[in-house]
Amino acid sequence: MTTLDSILAGRYPAKAHARRVAERLQVGGSGRNGIIYLEAQKTRLIEDNDEAMHFRQRRPFFYLSGCPLPDSSLIYNIASDKLTLFIPPIDPEDVIWSGLPMSVAEALRLYDVDQVLHTTDVNATLASIASDGNGKSVAFAIEGQITEGIKFDGFLETNTSVLKGAIDSTRVVKDEYEIALLRKANDISAKAHIAAIEASKTATNEREIEAAFLATCIANGARDQAYHPIVACGQNGATLHYGRNDDDLVDPVTKAGKSSVLIDAGAEYRTYCADITRVFPLGGRFTSETQEIYKIVLQMQLEAIAMLKENVQWEDVHAHAHRIAIKGLLKLGILRGSEDELFEKRISVAFFPHGLGHYLGMDTHDTGGNPNYADKDTMFKYLRVRGRLPAGSVITVEPGIYFCRFIIEPYLTSPETSKYIDTNVLEKYWNVGGVRIEDNVHVTQQGYENLTTAPKAIEEVEVLAT
């Protein structure tokens, strides 16, 4: 049986990715003599400082190389199916401070490429390929990602308009190796979420919970985060991308403790991301109001996940989650009216204002979702993925219900919408802040595979928090 570790012990499948991108470029006939040229991110210094900025590899380059090194480049010769990686030559002055860089032999062993040269060889290689193509080769590159001095002389055309889109579209469907990386990022993140919940038992501030999450990720091999963690206690959870993470868990004025914490955080492992959200109680038990909302959100998520399979229409899944929210809020008395009328009037958007999820991969909000932020339908405006989900895609499923005054109060002051919300009942729920539950799900031909193992059942979460 193939294990996660055995898959990841192999090389990142850069060559297969290059072939898939070339197919999407639809090069045929004489166009098969084309090349793909990509550059890594450059080493950059902090302004007015001699320290390097935090390095984040360019995703298109990594996708076709698996190489995390800065200041590198690659050429994929489509006709010969040859992938060449170019790495920086040795800089004697840099060796004094940083040690010897990766050698050509080591890079050839580590990465799924046919040849490794130095970046000083790029122009000579380009000239040779152009000559072999008799002036009929097309050079595909990305606008704004070509170093000054790189020469495409002798090529029929330098096309900088289609490669980025071809890579972005190809990235939607993940291969076995990519799924393994995403699973590993999820495994590490699950451990970190558990550590964060356990840390809350002695923490006095949001930052201590964040610190526990970060420390666990680093200790388990994920030094980078997929995005800035969100650690939001009490009403801070009503802010979707709250990021201050520095609020006291007990109000310094009233001495009242916050009831719960929403933590949205995920590790980045070898360039691939996890994106997980959990809500847990402070003090070991959810308040009755938070538990009521939690149960609705969990049902929204479980039913949405159950719908996932190849070619499912994502808008349908999102709409179903809204209907579950409406049913739950009607049962609590927060909403008034019929389910169908509330759905048609989009009243649930006041409490669930964002999309159900997004593609996940090398970016947290991964490529290929084709969102329509100009959509006038408020229920779908912020849906980051539109259309049918292909097998092999990985998508987040993250429904939520929030009690954000800024969003809800316009509904309360409008004659058209105020009649659907019972303000007397609503008053009891402001302190809930927000509840969001988020998992990362691999869509398959048969259905789905949930990559996220962090506990989310109320009983499990309360045990960890006690």
UniProtKB/Swiss-Prot annotation:
What keywords does the record list, in alphabetical order? Aminopeptidase, Hydrolase, Manganese, Metal-binding, Metalloprotease, Protease
Please provide an example of a Pfam family that matches this protein in its UniProt record: Peptidase_M24
Which positions in this protein are listed as binding Mn(2+) 2? Answer: D264, D275, E438
State its Enzyme Commission number(s).
3.4.11.9
**Per its UniProt record, what Gene3D superfamilies does this chain match?**
Creatinase/methionine aminopeptidase superfamily, Creatinase/prolidase N-terminal domain
UniProt cofactor(s) = Mn(2+)
Q: Which family does it belong to?
A: Belongs to the peptidase M24B family.
What's the protein here called? Probable Xaa-Pro aminopeptidase pepP
Say which species the protein is native to.
Answer: Aspergillus niger (strain ATCC MYA-4892 / CBS 513.88 / FGSC A1513)
Q: What is the lineage of its organism?
A: Eukaryota, Fungi, Dikarya, Ascomycota, Pezizomycotina
